[in-house]
Amino acid sequence: MQPEEQQIPDQEAQNLNETLGSGETGDGLSFSAEKYPYYQMLTENQQSVYRQIYANAQDLTEKFAPEKTVSASDVKTAFEAVIGDHPEMFWLETGYSSKYLANGQCVEIDLKYNSTADDLESAKQRFDAAAQNLITGAASLDSNYEKEKYVHDALASAVTYDLTADMNQSAYSALVNGKSVCA
């Protein structure tokens, strides 16, 4: 997950500042420690850019300016946390681009989306149906261990390791397409 980073001159950053909005800010979003452990490990500024990345990815916004002053390193850390916490956001590629100033301040984040973003509602339905099949199969089992083992074994038998698979590091690739690699 190596971002494409580009250092830009101050004048170009000023032009970006005048034309590029912050997109969705993610204000009001909350992420519990139990379900979203990576979010909890972030600094306050990193959490802010995490919420902004999450909200813009939900809205399929491609380019936006960070709402708070953050470094390129902070953006990378926040982006990796979003990817780790949200495998259900299968339409978001595991790489992004950013522009930053000589002092390291990030001034633009460019998210990348895979082909499922073109018909996201249908893709979500296929993903949810595949996930529901696993949940239904595990539901009658007694212990959490048995349920986890059922899901593990079902995935191991249904998914083929394929370096050339489309979206090969996503939950969608594994659940819907049946081909993936370890992320």
Task: State where each predicted segment sits.
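N-terminal accessory/pre-domain segments preceding catalytic cores
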Residues: 1-142
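Gly/Ser-rich catalytic serine loop of serine hydrolases
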Residues: 181-183
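Secondary-structure boundary elements
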Residues: 119-174
